[in-house]
Amino acid sequence: MINTPPILVDICWTLYRSNTTFDFLDAIISKKSYRLLRAFFKTKVGYRGNILLYRLTHIDWQRRLAIRYLKGMSKAALAAEANSFIAKLEQTKRIGTSFDILSRQQAPIIIISGTIDCIATAVGHRLHAQKICSSTLEYHNGICTGKLKEDILLNKKKYIGIDHFAILTDNTTDVDIVKQAEKAFIVCYSNKDWWEKQHLQHAEYHYEYDQRY
């Protein structure tokens, strides 16, 4: 194991059938205005508008606005809620194939995910991860400001810092990192044809039923 390169591990739709940031927010926030916000972004206008704004500003406005509802929550409370949330995902949305891969590889684990830090930390501790890289919530005196201090959602490559590694992911946006990896384990959904067209000789594909659509 000492000479085994670490494996970079994504979380959302790789370890669990979940967009963990939004599913977590949905689970702990009950305000009507939050529910209306989520409902709007699920409409055709809201969905397409968010995509357009992202292309113009490189900001996921649905995510940014939703995270504001964490304002006023303590870091300790969020950690406790995240641990409870992940425990429930383990029971209902765990992707067994991915955990089998990690068990088989017996490699040091580096969590690298765009999800928020309280969730990534909860997952990382369960997997005894060597390192955890995630989007970081901003706190002031231990209280969440409702803002992101750092967002790595589409900028994971910046945080790797190593030359030799394997990767376990489902994200097409991770393709540049996948190409750098010595070994890649790809969780494929409706994007399986796209992945296969990349002709990644070092990749192992695992097909899952896409429950998002």
PLM segments and residue spans:
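Active-site neighborhood of HAD-like aspartate-dependent phosphohydrolases
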Residues: 1-53
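C-terminal cap/substrate-recognition subdomain and adjoining C-terminal extension
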Residues: 2-3, 80, 87-213
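Short N-terminal micro-motifs specific to bacterial/archaeal maturation
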Residues: 12-15, 69, 169
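Short, charge-rich amphipathic segments
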Residues: 26-36, 49-60, 86-97, 113
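Short, compositionally biased "basic patch" segments
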Residues: 46-73, 127, 131
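Metal-dependent phosphoesterase signature
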Residues: 61-96
